[in-house]
């Protein structure tokens, strides 16, 4: 019998894919976004119930009923509450203080690092972490997997994570907190995520890396996958998309950026004879270009028109390429 799983905040089903690959039976997914629900329903590998719903309106009993499970049937719950309240943008120093500090440092001027306030910005979505816990408490699964961005560990966000962990431990769960790095598990992308692994039987063990940037020093570990390897064959004309063509204000600048570089290639700091930009005046991923010899940076969910990473051939990434890097 395969272990039943319920996926909360399911999105397009990333954790469901992982659970399925691990031999589990994903019985149900709960997701609020209608487009994501359609993606779940069209996934040929997925055969569970898709519920378009706000998790805060559901009970633990309703979750088990949705998955066709009785009160005492084995169950694991997985999910990642919305990350936006915990992302770097949510705790970055405001009013440009951080940018001024970094610019002064880059120019060799004396500067004092601004102090951040430890109060988090108001965002109701922060409460969804404990809604995830509430559903665990009410449905009483054998274990759980919770996922979020690394910055949920930031001092402004840590109390939310600790409240979850403390509640789980008081309820009898062994909890392991770990930082997962996609690049260490055969993915050509330097995406990192915090995971809480919970079990009522014994303390869960975090999976060991299979790949390493220092593979020559790590015995049996494989070398990390590069973007060039992951995207091999996808630069073919049959995969062309009109949206990949870059036009507009910074198109010529993008073409001059070397692989692995960003807008700083057009600064005096980088030795450009006719600099357009001053270093530390743009976000680091502005005009950012992939290096085919290295893993990709994390792909942004909703990038702006000049937000990278761009392909090293000075175009936007194609859908099949973004999928290959995920």
Task: Go through each PLM region and give its residues.
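Conserved hydrophobic/aromatic beta-strand scaffold that supports enzyme active sites
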Residues: 78, 177-179, 195-197, 298
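Flexible, glycine-/basic-rich loop-and-beta segments that form/coincide
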Residues: 186-245
